[in-house]
UniProtKB/Swiss-Prot annotation:
GO molecular function: ATP binding; GTP binding; RNA binding
Residues that coordinate or bind GTP: 56-59
Name of the encoding gene: rapZ
Classification via HAMAP family: RapZ_like (MF_00636)
Keywords carried by this UniProt record: ATP-binding, GTP-binding, Nucleotide-binding, RNA-binding
Cystine bridges: none
Region listing for RNA-binding, in residue ranges: 266-284
Cited function: Modulates the synthesis of GlmS, by affecting the processing and stability of the regulatory small RNA GlmZ. When glucosamine-6-phosphate (GlcN6P) concentrations are high in the cell, RapZ binds GlmZ and targets it to cleavage by RNase E. Consequently, GlmZ is inactivated and unable to activate GlmS synthesis. Under low GlcN6P concentrations, RapZ is sequestered and inactivated by an other regulatory small RNA, GlmY, preventing GlmZ degradation and leading to synthesis of GlmS.
Binding site for ATP: 8-15
Summary of subunit composition and partner proteins: Homotrimer.
Source species, domain of life: Bacteria
Protein name (Swiss-Prot/TrEMBL): RNase adapter protein RapZ
Similarity field: Belongs to the RapZ-like family. RapZ subfamily.
Length: 284
């Protein structure tokens, strides 16, 4: 397991790095006092979970020996790594001007420039110990997150999770949907008394819908649309793509179509989840 310690000058991108690490599966803690690192590591060792902890000038120990001692108290199952983010002085000044935030050392009645310089001196012990130093001066938020994934996971893109969910329009459109497709125009199994009690997960309903050309055409055109834009969506720094398929009640057509799309992209090696809102409500 990895204990990633994220440090760096204020404004260099520590919050961005912590969010990216969280997306990679790290248990993240912002501004944990150094003396509590062993306690956190021991707790997470029981869960077999890697962790990322940010340390900045606000929770730096007064003596470097405190940090070194904390490192010696980590359980053997953890491999500590220190990531230090930095940026040039002018970039940090510009970022603070853009966000209009106060520097952590501004409470000492220092000017922004003086606060940045003093912070550099205070963080030098960590910088000199860093396993990886990243200069974010010319990086966007997305580029920093991408670099971390490349360095830590050995691949450029994070794995996008495609979520196909069915719903009923009479219950409302899901607010988490990135795309919403309406299948109320497709033949409706509801009007067949034998199929009405069933759902789109049942074979008789699937056979009914499978007999109709318009159902095949809709599924083909929808998956083709998603395939065309999926490469760009995968590089757009997102973790999930939620595709909602809606019919009137969310029981037959939308369930079947959502499952067909999920099976198709799953067979193409994508990370896929499927859920059925109306069916989940019926189980409650």
């Amino acid at each position: 397991m990895v204990l990633m310690i994220v440090s760096g000058r204020s404004g260099s991108g520590k919050s961005v790095a912590l969010r990216a690490l969280e997306d990679m599966g790290f248990y993240c803690v912002d501004n944990l006092p150094v003396v509590l690192l062993p306690q956190l590591a021991n707790t997470l060792a029981e869960r077999n979970s890697s962790a990322a902890v940010s340390i900045d000038v606000r929770n730096m120990p007064e003596s470097p020996e405190v940090f070194e001692y904390a490192m010696t108290q980590l359980p053997d199952s953890f491999s500590p790594q220190l990531l230090f983010l930095d940026a040039d002085r002018n970039t940090l000044i510009r970022r603070y001007s853009d966000t209009r935030r106060l520097h952590p050392l501004s409470s000492k009645n220092l000017s922004l420039e003086s606060a940045i310089d003093e912070e550099s001196d205070l963080l030098e012990p960590l910088r000199s110990r860093a396993d990886l130093i990243i200069d974010t001066s010319e990086m966007s938020v997305h580029e920093l997150a991408e670099m971390l994934r490349t360095r830590l996971l050995g691949k450029r893109e994070r794995e996008l999770t495609m979520v196909f969910e069915s719903f009923g329009f009479k219950h409302g459109i899901p607010i988490d949907a990135d795309y919403v497709f309406d299948v109320r125009f497709l033949p409706n199994p509801h009007w067949d008394p034998k199929l009405r009690p069933m759902t789109g997960l049942d074979k008789p309903v699937a056979s009914f819908l499978d007999r109709h050309t318009e159902v095949h055409n809709f599924i083909y055109q929808t998956r083709s649309y998603l395939e065309q834009w999926l490469p760009m969506l995968e590089t757009n720094n997102r973790s999930y793509l939620t595709v909602a398929i809606g019919c009137t009640g969310g029981k037959h057509r939308s369930v079947y179509v959502a499952e067909q799309l999920a099976d198709y992209f799953r067979s193409r090696g994508k990370n896929v989840q499927s859920r059925h809102r109306t069916l989940e409500k019926r189980k409650q």
